Amino acid sequence: FTLIEIMVVVVILGLLAALVVPRIGPQVAEAQRTMARSQIKSFEEALEMYRMHNGFYPSTQQGLDALVKAPTISPVPKHYVEGGYLKKVPDDPWGNPYIYRNRNGRIQIVSTGPDGEEGGEGEGADVTNDD
């Protein structure tokens, strides 16, 4: 191949990449949001099982880790399932820990989204169980 032929191929590949990459970005972001919603749904199901066995949800202080290992701080569950309710608590799709709150029996689970901070709008918006 001549240098000109190779340069033409590189330019064509560059143009194709310029057309394809912008279309993939939004799909990746939506896939991450869908994954976060799915993980939050799994947490809700495990939390409901925890509540059915013990009569209450884990406290905010106990957090989602109470689904993996029996809490030792109050309120201590009396009927904790051997092996726990989840094998582990994964981070959200952006690598951030989920935020769990128990406000008088009302559960809130938050993924802080791609910006890693609570709040935000648009692509930086949080994903919650309230969505």
Regions found by a protein language model. Give the residues of each.
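N-terminal single-pass transmembrane signal-anchor helix
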Residues: 1-24
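Phosphate-coordinating loops and pocket residues in cytosolic domains that bind phosphorylated ligands
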Residues: 21, 26, 62, 69
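Short, surface-exposed interaction loops/tails
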Residues: 26, 30-34, 41, 45-48, ...
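Non-catalytic regulatory appendages
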Residues: 42-44, 48-51, 61, 72, ...
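Extracytoplasmic electron-transfer domains, predominantly the class I c-type cytochrome c fold
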Residues: 68-82, 89-91
